[in-house]
Amino acid sequence: MITNFFSVLTPFTFTSAISFNFPSFSSLEPNISFENAYANEDKVIQITGSKLTPWYHGRATYFRPMHLWDKGSKNLTDFATHFSFVIDSQNLSNYADGVAFFLAPNGSKIYRASNGSDLGLYNPALNSTENSFFAVEFDIWSNYQLDPPREHVGIDINSIISVANVSWLSNITIMEGNLNEAWINYNSSSQNLSVIFTGFKNNVTVNQSVLYCWFEKGPTWMG
């Protein structure tokens, strides 16, 4: 479940910057596109299954596309986002794959035939250039040959095999359905992508991080 969302996207001129803040959600919100997802009675976005609808995946995207990079100048866009979310296994040891923040080409749709490991983004029938997306995955299920053998946070670029990942101290938060937070920042000048997120160690919430130098160009407009 996504509980709140704040994002600032700063392209090449200040006047074209995009900023939005959602302290709560409604399924009637015109600025969010829901695919197999909805805002529940707690005013949070439900994007995976519940006891009534297991093995379910969905996603929610902001309606306005982001100018990710300029072909003429070769400039990339700075962006920063902060959101909070809950993954609740409902005290079950066999649970789903997790949740991801993503950027995908404008107009892209959820891949409905995907397995949980595909994040609703990756289509195994396509090649690496056709699978165009960026994602930060909060992965709680280890898929053989795709993931490290542990809960982890990974950075994905056009593939569900992460280019960088770090162990996520998340087991207690998953079993108890506790709140998690994440901050994702990209500085186009330094090409540094920073992901800071909360974990849980010795009954105390701790901050963890994963970094990556991202310079690859992709589609001009992302959503």
What are these regions (language model features)?
Residues M1-G223:
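Polar, low-complexity loop segments and adjacent catalytic/binding residues used for recognizing
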